[in-house]
């Protein structure tokens, strides 16, 4: 499980883009705060940041003709098996959304994709 550097979202092949959507759904739902070495940093921030990242993924999906469930466009939604947030303070989006998504992380993501035979 990993969140690709946001600069790569629009360049990701279909499988990685759709996989990213699934991972965001899992993290926003019952996966919230469950330890995983590659994504632990997201739990240091408001869940609203994950919503912002997920929104980038879903907007790219829509550009490509996919139809993510509209429920996920609600920042309070956490999936069918998890209670929605009652309240979640809206925060201004930063660039990058997560400070961990720096140049070093971008290169790490590119290397990971390259190992899968994907050159971006």
Question: What are these model-derived regions, one by one?
Answer:
Residues 1-120:
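Expand to "…catalyze enediolate/carbanion chemistry for C-C bond making/breaking, isomerization
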């Amino acid at each position: 499980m990993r969140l690709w550097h946001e600069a790569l979202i629009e360049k990701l092949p279909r499988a990685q883009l759709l996989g990213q959507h699934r991972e965001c759904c899992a993290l926003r739902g019952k996966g919230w705060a469950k330890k995983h070495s590659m994504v632990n940093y997201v739990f240091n921030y408001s869940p609203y940041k994950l919503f912002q990242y997920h929104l980038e993924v879903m907007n790219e999906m829509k550009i490509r003709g996919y139809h993510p469930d509209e429920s996920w466009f609600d920042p309070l939604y956490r999936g069918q098996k998890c209670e929605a947030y009652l309240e979640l303070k809206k925060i201004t989006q930063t660039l990058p959304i997560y400070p961990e998504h720096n140049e070093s992380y971008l290169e790490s993501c590119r290397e990971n994709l390259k190992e899968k035979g994907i050159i971006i």
